[in-house]
Amino acid sequence: MGKSRTKRFKRPQFSPIESCQAEAAAASNGTGDEEDDGPAAELLEKLQHPSAEVRECACAGLARLVQQRPALPDLARRDAVRRLGPLLLDSSLAVRETAAGALRNLSACGGFDVCDDMVAKDIMTPLVALLRECLSGLDSNEMSPQEKADKRNPVESIANEAVNVLWNVCECSGRAVSIFNKEGCLEIVLQYLRRFPTSIDLAVSVAYCLQTVTEDNPELLKSFDGTALRVLESALLCPVASMEYILLKTLVAGTIWNLKDIIPSKSQAEIINAILGALSEVLGMNTGNMVIQMKEAETQRLKTAAESEDILANANGDDLVEDDEMEEIPHKRKLRRKTFISDLLPPTDKELREAMALLTAQQTALEVIVNMCCSEDPSDDEWEELSSSDESEAFMENSFSECSGHLMSPLCLSHEIHSALTNCLIPEKVFEKTSSPNSVAVDICSKNPTWKPLIRKMNTIQCRALMCLQSLVSLLDIDHLGGAPALQTLAQHLSQILFSQPDFAKHDDFLEAISSALRALLQTMASKNIPQCMTPEQLMTLCREGIHSSSIGVRVNVVSILGITGSVLAKDDGTLDTLKTIGCFLLEVATKDPSLVVTGEALDALFDVFADGEAAEKASVQIKLLAALKEFQPVFKMKIRKEGRGKYSPDQLCVLDNVKMNLRRFIAYQETVEKRLTS
């Protein structure tokens, strides 16, 4: 497998309320295709209104509108970014915050093209200026009594929104990252990060941004001095006051890993142990139990609050009865509470935030471990190895051309990473995370709309753990994985996970993750002559379902699994019928799959299965393998010539050229086999 980049989770969707409800309703009904009287035109026009409250509500309406994909072209045509940008420096703090919120949503929902357009329209100039102003404001800001009562710092909230915009555009635009480097944004965001003891939300946003901008950015690494590293170290080692601090530590661990090239060699072992120690800590937490506990706590809190409201309502009711006859007493006026950007978000109760923070931290931890194991990415299509067993080399001799040399370089871990992985018990904790999500927690979340997104998060953690397991099994010595018995137990565990889900074939992410893990595990077991616990029938069930997947990765994995299994069975007696079944399956895939990547892997699997062994030779003759491959050979050459240059990368074409050459040699080998058996 190649490197698995950390992916951000989707932003909370804005839901304008109270005085902004009319603007929000107008935005919700818009399609983005309307003429000048549509919601986009009206909202953008109100951005220039002399009233700060009107400008604020217009920004809130735009924050809602940009979530509707059809509206994005209309907003771009009307130059929404150039109109929103100046409002980041508006005289009203509330307008600044809602404008930043609208740009945050726009950058999150619009993707690469929109973010590039935002940078082209110079959003970075007011954004960087706002970040600098907020930094000064945080140091000198005096909150009003009401703000203190609400435990809410408006300048900090603006900074948080601005950092999220910065993160989004830097994740999607190389030009934004370049500006980040040149404008000294690193120093600004590190000053924000220093405030983690009192401003955890802001610190987490900064940590996300730092993890993004430090990836593959050697220019920025030059700006990291001892002071900057100490800021990261203090965040990494901070005491845990909540699950959000766990998330912060995990993100900072990922950032420090991105800085590995500037860490002195004498300190690397210590730093790697600190990183993996933090990741081990988060993976050691039971997410299922945490979700259950947090939901119970929320239920109890809401119950207590409802009881308190009932008592207060009854008391107020008694007072109103006494005042009924007092005609001069006006009706009680409903106070209009000031609308903050947090009001524009869906309700995020503290228990839900805690649960989501832990789940996100665990997902991030697993992704960082995968990156640590796969710092070099030789191929995007999981088929850097041209052969999955030594037997195929018996007849192919030195069959690999020079261009495949870098593809065949074995993955390896430094001694420091290898030791830290085992010392921090990472393999054991990753194994635990491969289990299916806690059924009680899933049931609880499924019954509550605001908690339901946690189910997808729990499933994502399982998939990340399976991908992480694949890396660990491929790279660690089997002794550090628990030896042969542990690998056999793991194979049974993966089999149970797979076949306990009758509809597993419908979930491509899960199927790709578990087939990748199985592929690596079976390869390791085969190379060490460890008996496999999954039956050929079980594997054929997986392969028959997986080969119909729309994911090329899944299809590559299942044919590779059959190649590994078949090459093992070819050494045993009484396997003729199974080998024939495997051969027919692989032959059909090789000749009918629309992807040359899958075709190449299927041919390679055939080379492995039928490279050697009496049963394999008999099976190849009985399924007429030689005739089928001779017929397919010119078709394969033509497909490479016709489709290759336009659809596949140079590395993939290099591998396909090797498969083409190996096919010629394999046909020659099969001719000698058939002649010997039929003469």
Curated annotation (Swiss-Prot):
Disulfide bonds: none
UniProt keyword annotation of Transmembrane present: no
Keyword set includes Repeat: yes
PTM-bearing positions, type Phosphothreonine: 339
Keywords: Erythrocyte maturation, Phosphoprotein, Repeat, Ribosome biogenesis
Basic residues biased stretches: 1-11
Gene Ontology BP, a term: ribosomal large subunit biogenesis
Residue ranges of the region described as Disordered: 1-40
Per-repeat ranges for HEAT: 38-69, 74-110
Sites of Phosphoserine modification: 15, 144
Role, per record: Plays a role in ribosome biogenesis and in nuclear import of the 60S ribosomal protein L5/large ribosomal subunit protein uL18 (RPL5). Required for proper erythrocyte maturation.
Family: Belongs to the nuclear import and ribosome assembly adapter family.
Record-linked PANTHER family: HEAT REPEAT-CONTAINING PROTEIN 3
Subunit structure, as described in the record: Component of a hexameric 5S RNP precursor complex, composed of 5S RNA, RRS1, RPF2/BXDC1, RPL5, RPL11 and HEATR3; this complex acts as a precursor for ribosome assembly.
Official protein name in the record: HEAT repeat-containing protein 3
